[in-house]
Regions:
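Membrane-anchoring hydrophobic helices of lipid-metabolizing enzymes
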Residues: 1-63, 77
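Soluble catalytic domains of membrane acyltransferases
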Residues: 48-176
Length: 176
């Protein structure tokens, strides 16, 4: 058990190394390593995750998955069930914590500063461009989650769907 936890601690700098060297490690490799770490977390936390409707995902090109947001595991759960590399747009303030930073960096996630409209517009443009190039993204249109929301969908933020609309890309609804 101690050796297993030491290995997991070693994964954090390893994830950082992989994310700093995208020229050496492909997007697919980094995504699979992210999924490997998610599997270890699932085992430790005794979490089971099931995905349904994957046959309905677009076969080619980029698309944006829009999901309700219930908690910290949501993006990881979607990535666990999604075979093709995808990325995520996340609140900058929450994206620099231990392990979260490494997960976001590995998938080249976008950090959105909620209170900075100019930066947010730039992120929307980046996501639009990358979706046009074939990347897949996870966006939580409610902008976050509240522990008190009682499993209700929060209101969507204005502009949440702009990147998919501007890219003329499929919008994939995801329910958690």
């Amino acid at each position: 058990m101690i050796a297993g936890n030491l290995y997991r601690a070693w994964m954090i700098p390893k994830m950082g190394y992989y994310s700093r060297h995208p020229e050496k490690y492909s997007e697919q490799f980094r995504y699979e390593y992210d999924r490997y770490a998610i599997n270890l977390m699932k085992k430790t936390g005794r979490i089971t995750t099931e995905g349904f409707g994957m046959e309905n995902l677009p076969k080619e090109g980029g698309y944006v998955m829009f999901s309700n947001h219930q908690g910290k595991y949501d993006a990881l759960g979607i990535m666990h069930t999604h075979d093709k590399p995808c990325s995520v747009v996340m609140d900058d303030a929450r994206s620099h914590g231990p392990l979260v930073k490494q997960f976001i960096d590995l998938v080249e996630g976008k950090r959105l500063k909620i209170d900075n409209l100019k930066q947010a517009a730039g992120i929307i443009k980046e996501v639009t461009r990358e979706v046009k190039e074939g990347r897949k993204f996870i966006i939580f249109p409610s902008g976050g989650y509240e522990h008190r929301n009682g499993n209700y969908v929060d209101e969507f933020k204005p502009g949440a769907f702009k990147s998919a609309m501007k890219a003329k890309a499929p919008i994939v609804p995801v329910a958690i």
